[in-house]
């Protein structure tokens, strides 16, 4: 069940600003709207219920240190920074896209600080800040260059922006890994969120987004489309969150469990909710949390909105 307070049908006119500022009002309106949609993406992900091993409206999943309120507080703290990512991209749109990432990092660090302050030190959305920050920054850059900001253009721009991220942050420290992400790369070749960004959000573009848009086009609800997309993402994503908690065996188990529900019909399966609830109990017992796929689910929904929004502004 998705919280009804999360309004999916955002009207751009709701963000009209009356101002004597010389700034481009349509630009301000657009960035406020995109930032708002980024916030909605975070809220939709956490409110989707049930989910296996993840915090939702009914359970804390495999997490002992956080609940739905922790996530809501975190999302609210991050929200103001999304428009800052957008303007960081816009303000550096006269520079090559492959030089954008360092300009986004300060905003990301400030967003992380706000998140930790809101959650008393609990990491709820660090991966989400990374992914949403890059996507929003790229949208700002594309807008500054009068380019479309649909999913395809965002994907290509993210790939150019982050093309050497794996080399700079994972391969260079291959022999002496300093972080757990570097260790997972050395031991298993897993690149996590960095690899997803460097690939141009390939898992989202190849799996999550097509599943979401196809399901919506077939007449299913947003909630059902989100379930379908989450299962497709879980079945295909090399989720380092799962590996950190359950090793490669945990990742394989989660992938097979998601694939099993897809074989039964996914969102078309009449017992999906009850089986997701049962799977949540199993994941919780095994301490498995597909947090990487949860982040990609939010990105999937946001890119679907950009496909609808971009033609109205370009």
Swiss-Prot record:
Keyword Transcription found: no
EC number: 2.4.2.52
Enzyme class name: transferase
Keywords, alphabetical: ATP-binding, Nucleotide-binding, Transferase
GO molecular function annotation: ATP binding; triphosphoribosyl-dephospho-CoA synthase activity
Reaction(s) the record says it catalyses: 3'-dephospho-CoA + ATP = 2'-(5''-triphospho-alpha-D-ribosyl)-3'-dephospho-CoA + adenine
PANTHER family, sorted: 2-(5''-TRIPHOSPHORIBOSYL)-3'-DEPHOSPHOCOENZYME-A SYNTHASE, TRIPHOSPHORIBOSYL-DEPHOSPHO-COA SYNTHASE
Family: Belongs to the CitG/MdcB family.
Protein name from the UniProt record: Probable 2-(5''-triphosphoribosyl)-3'-dephosphocoenzyme-A synthase
């Amino acid at each position: 069940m998705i919280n009804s307070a999360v309004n999916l049908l955002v009207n751009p006119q709701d963000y009209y600003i009356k101002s004597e500022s010389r700034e481009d009002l349509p630009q301000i309106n657009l960035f406020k709207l995109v930032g708002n949609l980024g916030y909605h993406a975070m809220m939709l992900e956490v409110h989707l219920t049930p989910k296996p091993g993840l915090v939702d409206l009914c359970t804390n999943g495999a997490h002992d240190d956080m609940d739905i309120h922790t996530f809501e507080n975190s999302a609210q703290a991050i929200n103001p920074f999304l428009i800052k990512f957008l303007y960081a991209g816009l303000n550096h749109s006269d520079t090559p896209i492959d030089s954008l990432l360092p300009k986004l990092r300060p905003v990301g660090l400030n967003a992380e600080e706000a998140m930790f302050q809101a959650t008393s030190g609990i990491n709820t959305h660090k991966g989400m800040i990374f992914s949403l920050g890059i996507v929003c920054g790229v949208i700002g850059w594309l807008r500054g260059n009068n380019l479309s900001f649909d999913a395809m253009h965002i994907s290509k721009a993210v790939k150019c922006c982050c093309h050497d991220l794996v080399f700079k942050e994972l391969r260079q420290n291959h022999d002496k890994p300093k972080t757990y992400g570097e260790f997972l790369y050395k031991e298993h070749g897993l690149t996590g969120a960095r690899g997803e960004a460097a690939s141009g959000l390939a898992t989202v573009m190849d799996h999550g987004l097509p599943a979401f848009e196809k399901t919506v086009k077939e007449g299913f609800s947003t909630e059902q489309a989100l379930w379908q997309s989450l299962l497709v993402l879980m079945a295909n994503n090399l989720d380092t969150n799962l590996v950190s908690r359950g090793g490669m065996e945990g990742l394989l188990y989660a992938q097979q469990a998601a694939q099993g529900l897809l074989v039964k019909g996914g969102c078309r399966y009449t017992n999906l909710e009850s089986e997701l609830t049962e799977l949540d109990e199993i994941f919780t017992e095994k301490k498995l949390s597909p947090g990487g796929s949860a982040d990609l689910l939010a990105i999937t929904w946001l890119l679907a909105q950009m496909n609808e929004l971009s033609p109205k502004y370009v």
